[in-house]
């Protein structure tokens, strides 16, 4: 079988960040009866479901550690490796940090797919690492029933510049650096519904590096930051609100969307992860049409950064984004929490 004819997505039951275990199930898995080990230098653990762990070295610098891997979301091996690596490195940028090295995680069905195809996957990962200015310094591989690839990434950040997902404030405006709809468009492609003019759009977005996050971290008015991945905009925004004790009002029309995404949702191109996300976070939403719900719950792979920004810092954030070719528009705002109101309201 040639590398050009291979369709990697046929060899896995899930795709990209849509492979994630649902938040409700994950909570059961992570629940522990053991006494919590307390380390005062661990600035960010898993209590707030943040993007990465952060450890204070005590010298003004903190280490960021993260890992992310998944099954193919595209058929091309090189693109799969590049997307998986870009997605993993994004967690460092989402914490406001700078990546310094990565190691690869590879699961490969050696009796089904050739090592040459696996090499193309790792080459895609290596390419993304070079884009981020880091080495792919090693890794680990196993014989697995389905192809899996990703990275464990280490980064650094000035301790005072760490950006968490739980430190937003009422009054902050919300910004999203990439359009939604990655799960929808990749599902439309699998269902042979994708129009020629939309071919490759999702791949291009997934391969965009969230490198701007390190620059956003230098802006005092950026109060919180996270990347939007497998739990969709609703999930990651809900976690931001829960961590800060605020509620969100979102302007649906202002949300950046991939071309054709609303049409494909109406045609049924909705990934399975969408329903899992709604089952976990739907009780936090206000009333809205099914099509809106399906987009907000759409699992993103290598999605954009979600920023909570004080109004006085809006112009600086937009100017910084423009330096990276990103045009930002506010998609909503955070307001004080009030009982009896949905955590995320759509206008």
UniProtKB/Swiss-Prot annotation:
Record EC number: 2.7.9.3
Keywords: ATP-binding, Kinase, Magnesium, Metal-binding, Nucleotide-binding, Selenium, Transferase
Effect of residue 51 to A: Complete loss of activity
Effect of mutating residue 227 to A: Complete loss of activity
Active site: 17
Gene Ontology biological process terms in this record: selenocysteine biosynthetic process; tRNA seleno-modification
Result of altering residue 20 to Q: Complete loss of activity
Residues the record lists as binding ATP: 20, 48-50, 68, 91, 139-141
Reaction equations catalysed: hydrogenselenide + ATP + H2O = selenophosphate + AMP + phosphate + 2 H(+)
Gene Ontology molecular functions: ATP binding; identical protein binding; magnesium ion binding; protein homodimerization activity; selenide, water dikinase activity
Site description Important for catalytic activity, residues in chain: 20
InterPro entries noted in UniProt: PurM-like_C_dom (IPR010918), PurM-like_C_sf (IPR036676), PurM-like_N (IPR016188), PurM-like_N_sf (IPR036921), SelD_I (IPR023061), SPS/SelD (IPR004536)
Record has S-adenosyl-L-methionine as a keyword: no
Pfam families assigned: AIRS, AIRS_C
A GO cellular component entry from the record: cytosol
Source organism superkingdom: Bacteria
EC category: transferase
Obligatory cofactor(s): Mg(2+)
Effect on the protein of changing residue 13 to N: No loss of activity
Positions of Mg(2+) binding: 51, 91, 227
Result for mutant: residue 20 to R: Marked loss of activity
Cofactor note (record): Binds 1 Mg(2+) ion per monomer.
Subunit note: Homodimer.
Family per similarity comment: Belongs to the selenophosphate synthase 1 family. Class I subfamily.
Function: Synthesizes selenophosphate from selenide and ATP.
UniProt protein name: Selenide, water dikinase
Gene: selD
């Amino acid at each position: 079988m040639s590398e050009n004819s291979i369709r990697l997505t046929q060899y896995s039951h899930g795709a990209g960040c849509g492979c994630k275990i649902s938040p409700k199930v994950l909570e059961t898995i992570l629940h522990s009866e053991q006494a919590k080990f307390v380390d005062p230098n661990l600035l960010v653990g898993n209590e707030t479901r943040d993007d990465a762990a952060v450890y204070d070295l005590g010298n003004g610098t903190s280490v960021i550690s993260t890992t992310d891997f998944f099954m193919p979301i595209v058929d091309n091996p090189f693109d799969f490796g590049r997307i998986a690596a870009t997605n993993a490195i994004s967690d460092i940028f989402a914490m406001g940090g700078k990546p310094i090295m990565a190691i690869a995680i590879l699961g490969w069905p050696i009796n089904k797919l050739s090592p040459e195809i696996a090499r193309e996957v790792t080459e895609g990962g290596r390419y993304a690492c070079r884009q981020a200015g880091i080495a792919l310094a090693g890794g680990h591989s196993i014989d697995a029933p389905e192809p899996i690839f990703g990275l464990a990434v280490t980064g650094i950040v000035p301790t005072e510049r760490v950006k968490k997902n739980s430190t937003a404030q009422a009054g902050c405006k919300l910004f999203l650096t990439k359009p939604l709809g990655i799960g929808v468009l990749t599902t439309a492609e699998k269902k042979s519904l994708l129009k020629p003019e939309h071919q490759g759009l999702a791949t291009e977005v997934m391969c965009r590096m969230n490198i701007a996050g390190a620059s956003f971290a230098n802006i005092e008015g950026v109060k919180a930051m996270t990347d939007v991945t497998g739990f969709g905009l609703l999930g990651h925004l809900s976690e931001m609100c829960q961590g800060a004790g605020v509620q969100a009002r979102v302007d649906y029309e202002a949300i950046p969307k991939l071309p054709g995404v609303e049409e494909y949702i109406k045609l049924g191109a909705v990934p399975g992860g969408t329903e899992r996300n709604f089952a976990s976070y739907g009780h936090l939403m206000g009333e809205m049409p099914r099509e809106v719900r399906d987009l907000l719950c759409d699992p993103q792979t290598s999605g954009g950064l979600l920023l909570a920004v004080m109004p006085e810092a809006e112009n600086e954030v937009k100017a910084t984004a423009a330096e990276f070719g990103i045009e930002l528009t506010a998609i909503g705002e955070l307001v004080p929490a009030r009982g009896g109101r949905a955590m995320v309201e759509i206008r």
